[in-house]
Amino acid sequence: MFYLKYRNENFFIVKNNKLIITSYEKYYEFLKEILVINESKDTKIEFNGAKLNSKNTLIIDLSSISSATKIFNSENRLINEYIKTSLDNYSMDYEKENTINFTINEIMKKLYKELQLENVEIDILKLIKSHTSFAINNNDDFFVVLNEIVKSEDLKNIFIIYKKGILDFLKLNELEYIKNDKIILFEICDSNSKFKDGDNILFFDKDIYQITYNNLVDLILSKSKIQDLDRELFEFLLNNIFFYSINKKEVDIMRKHLKEIININDVLNKEFKINLMDTLDYI
């Protein structure tokens, strides 16, 4: 297991090249810090004792549909402007915010033609990092590029931030099976996330406990005063507390919100509401 250090604390844990973030608040705090790598700035984050920076780390953000269409970022404006101009000369449109919506091969073919080069290898990593924004249209493009990036001797870390739902949208499910020491997968969890036993890591304050999801559900259900509590309903409540929360304060806030939702629910009878809210206190 490896640890990412932030503010002199073990911030997140990496297990089997996969990191599961269970709090959106923590995720955005972390993301804001780590994305400065794409602006060629140093970070305050350490990975296995080494500071992360733009020279040794590449961030690929697939955590939302909007960010998935702007995968790679760089401040190399000169090459970026040149590529834009080259594409304009061939009447190829690009979307707002300089997002180029063509495949790697199309762009490289245009560059070959513009530079009058034949059978000359172009450093794909430099090509990608030259774009302010770069969109990849299909699986093949993405994995071809990723395989080329992995070969880079300068890059020691490649962080891919993703959500399962976005992977389905992009048809990039193979991403979860990537096996390379350089690549760390950041899975952003939400209330729809499904885990296998032993797959998830839950964070409580500064202590880290590994517990299977099903065992956790069974444990709390066993303490419930409600007979035959609907497991699906309970898992929804549990997900909304744990997979958005990381410390006691956040759990208390989420518990309060859920109790308010239960209280105004006209479908549930009064006794059921009381027992359900009482069950939440065990969490």
Label every PLM stretch briefly.
Residues 125-172:
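Conserved helicase/translocase P-loop NTPase motor core
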Residues 88-140:
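Conserved P-loop NTPase mechanochemical-coupling segment
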Residues 36-46, 154-155, 175-187:
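Structural alpha-beta junctions
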Residues 16-20, 156-160, 184:
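Residue-level preference for the first positions of well-ordered beta-strands
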